[in-house]
């Protein structure tokens, strides 16, 4: 029997823009209330909140879903805990958790831009060379935040003995590789392994886990980053955020999924990525071949002429 998001309650991080905003719209249109956790909201996200106002005196329902926002830095564990508490206070229960916020190895947290130091004073990196412990922001956001939010979600569901759905935003980068963004690829490889590892929860305690794995998608993740946007044309990015949102809804509502499923999504359709001996993805379909070619040229020039400064 098909599942339904109608009348459910969700947390979506990164819902202020891009894929996660498109998915937030999709959930609301299907009668699912959403609490968005993000650093900020794009104008279209602010308009969405106005369309689905929250009246604390009236519980949300399938006929009257609500949209709320809590400013959240997902790299902060206390802020993730506060986001979860806010959802518990606003909703009767939490049914769906989507750790969707992510960054695509920006110049300020990149393997090829090591942290600023006495011997590397001009680095654009915001990562701290003297951090105790040391860490990279791209891993904090892309990998550690979904793991921590998953702990909070599973604690909510198991303490109440209720079912739940954990839907993580992965990437085709979780099973391919590229020299230009090794931290990003590492984060998505780790994320897919994490999701698969939780797969037994579905048949043990009725907690469904899955990841969507898009190729390049026409979102601010590309367009707002000058290091990315000048290496790929909008014509090559065939998939829209709405395409991916449709596939994410399928992951939630199709009962055959949820046991650690990794669902690849491109403009041409979807496929379940098997855990072993998976056929390679079509990089052209994924829309990243032009980007990889451009970033490889940049990397080769930098590493051969300048080396790596730390």
Place the predicted regions along the sequence by residue.
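Canonical Rossmann dinucleotide-binding motif of NAD(H)/NADP(H)-dependent dehydrogenases/reductases
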Residues: 2-35
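Active-site-adjacent segment of SDR/Rossmann-fold oxidoreductases
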Residues: 30, 156-160, 176, 197-208, ...
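Conserved glycine-rich Rossmann-like NAD(P)H-binding loop of the short-chain dehydrogenase/reductase
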Residues: 30-47
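The beta1-alpha1 cofactor-binding region of Rossmann-like NAD(H)/NADP(H)-dependent oxidoreductases
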Residues: 42-44, 71-85
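Amphipathic alpha-helical dimer-interface segment in Rossmann-like NAD(P)H-dependent oxidoreductases
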Residues: 89, 102, 137-161, 199-200
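Catalytic Tyr-X3-Lys loop
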Residues: 114-150, 167, 191
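Residue(s) in the substrate-gating loop at a strand-loop-helix junction
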Residues: 171
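C-terminal helical subdomain
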Residues: 211, 228-286, 290-310
